């Protein structure tokens, strides 16, 4: 509850934020023009219709149309220089659900006072108990002074988090990055690093990496370079004396050999696009809508109390074939191809990616539409590059 009190007076706001020169804004003007054309066409169609009384049967359709109009307007906001931000202070009353989240005036902020944060008896939000001050975790042994005023709470917490004496922050980050490269962390419970989780297999290595990470200015890139150039990462997947390795390391927690890992779902899709020559390596920009299984794309889903529009991929291959990291994430609408290869769900924190070898993966690679499209792309690339049939066979 002390940590919760730090964020108790933090509110959301949509503030003006002009695009930076290095941001990817390609296609913005074309999308704005497309939205204007659709809006104008819809308005002309509505203006041409005769006035009619709304019958009870039409009421539901009108309600659905209004909600789809709200969704359309929200999608157009993606091309406006607006940033989803936060501020400290009183909340601002919204006149409509679709209205923009604006910060209150400075005068309104100066007249308000922070609300009291209390321990909720039994976890019930309507049973406020003993009041609690903003504070940090005492178990770390590192104290911090968090102000009770509106301003300064999150800044003080951030300074406590990145303090060199904080025993958690650097170790948690290092353990996560190590797990990304080796398939398992030095401590196998990344979400529960500490006394209640599994102890690290190599605690001295974890401590040294954490100190080195802080010493290098918290540089993630430098940490990646340090791990990838280490002898542990560059080891072979086989050992000249496997019996000795099995005897000395029966649980497989050591690093005498590098245990290969399967490509993650996103890496697999990107690799298939790269081999076929269809991958668009452009960085940044808006989320894209890749191709998806037709049956999954047409699957009904609910949003805002009514049915959502069907999933429609982006019209251009250059948009659809971006890297998977730029794909739009919809919690209720997941790509079956990526899910088959253990892509974690977006509705919960993923402690560790599970790896499975199941029959649907074989069918997805042999018979799936994704594989078929990539095979056609590879064939087109080979035929375009090769001068003869023998060259085409060699390239393939």
Predicted regions and their residues:
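C-terminal, active-site-flanking charged/polar segments
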Residues: 1-19
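A broadly conserved detector of short glycine/acidic/proline-rich loop/turn motifs that flank catalytic sites
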Residues: 7, 279, 329-331, 369
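Primarily short, surface-exposed interaction patches in extracytoplasmic proteins
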Residues: 23-321, 338, 344, 348-359, ...
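Short Ser/Thr-interspersed hydrophobic loop/turn segments at strand-loop and sheet-helix junctions
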Residues: 330, 334, 342-343
